[in-house]
Structure formats: C-alpha cells, structure tokens
Regions:
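Chalcogenol-based redox active-site neighborhoods
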Residues: 1-154
Length: 154
C-alpha cells in the first residue's frame, strides 16, 4: 500500500465524474483541493460527509477550495447520489480502484469482528502547486468542512 505524506506531490489521476466527463487532478493546479475518499454512496456516514461539504460549499469555494469526492461506485450510482442530495461538486468513479490504491486508502477494514477490503475514509488537502498540505485520516463526517479549514496549513 502506498504511504503518502505531507509535502509529497499528490498523485495525478484521470477518471470520469458522475456525468461521465473526464476529470483529472492536474486540471486543478492553481486551486486548493479537498480530495475526499469515502466508502460508498448513499450510506449514513458518506451521506453526512457529502452533505456537510455541500452545506458549506459556498464558504469553501470562497476560500479557494475545490471539493472532489472519490469512491469506487459507478458513474450511475454517483449520479443518483448527486441528484438525491444536490451535491455541487464532482464525484469520481474509481471502479477499478486505481486511484484509491494510488493514494493508499484501499485496504483491510473491520466491521463487527469481520475483516474485509474497502476504502478507508481519508481526506487529502492539496495546495495550489499539487502538493499534499495535510491528510485527515478518519475525518469527522458531520464536521468535515470545519476540519478542512482548521487543518489547512498556511
């Protein structure tokens, strides 16, 4: 598993968003990026996280942040999730797990004593030059946007 650190160059990727449009991290050079990895569309924790970012999107955008969500759900599931909760930011479909493995967030998890493989919820804060400014492991889903503001390293 890849281990990324603060100060590392954020790995570039190209995939598709919920509209089937190409999206690459490199196209956001010059902006601060909130790249958040989450396990599954329309589940309680993931919905709380997405809605918190949605509810604070204007504030984050006003401070120069671009929000991008990534999970290994399909384009169709992402579109349904976007529509249901009126999400104003791209959701990247990483069905083949290339991006989650590139960022080292795909691995063993445990639930009720059973081990399984999945995405470990993690948020990467990426600066305007494409470097990792901070990493929020196990973010607080209900307060993700405040964590972004509190943990951005100026």
């Amino acid at each position: 598993m890849t281990q990324l650190h603060i100060g590392d160059k954020a790995p570039d990727f190209t995939s598709v968003d919920q509209n089937g449009e190409p999206i690459s991290l490199g196209s956001f050079i010059g902006k601060k990026v909130v790249l958040y990895f989450y396990p599954k569309d329309d589940t309680p924790g993931c919905t709380a996280q997405a809605c918190n970012l949605r509810d604070n999107y204007a504030s984050l955008s006003g401070k120069g942040f671009q929000v991008i969500g990534v999970s290994n759900d399909s384009i169709k599931k992402h579109k349904k999730f976007e529509n249901k909760y009126e999400l104003p930011f791209p959701l990247v479909a990483d069905e083949d797990k290339t991006i989650v493995e590139l960022y080292g967030v795909y691995g063993e998890k445990k639930f009720m004593g059973k081990a399984y493989m999945g995405i470990n919820r993690t948020t990467f804060l990426i600066d305007e030059k494409g470097n990792i400014n901070n990493i929020i492991a196990k973010p607080d889903t209900a307060n993700q946007s405040q964590q972004v503001l509190d943990q951005w390293q100026s």
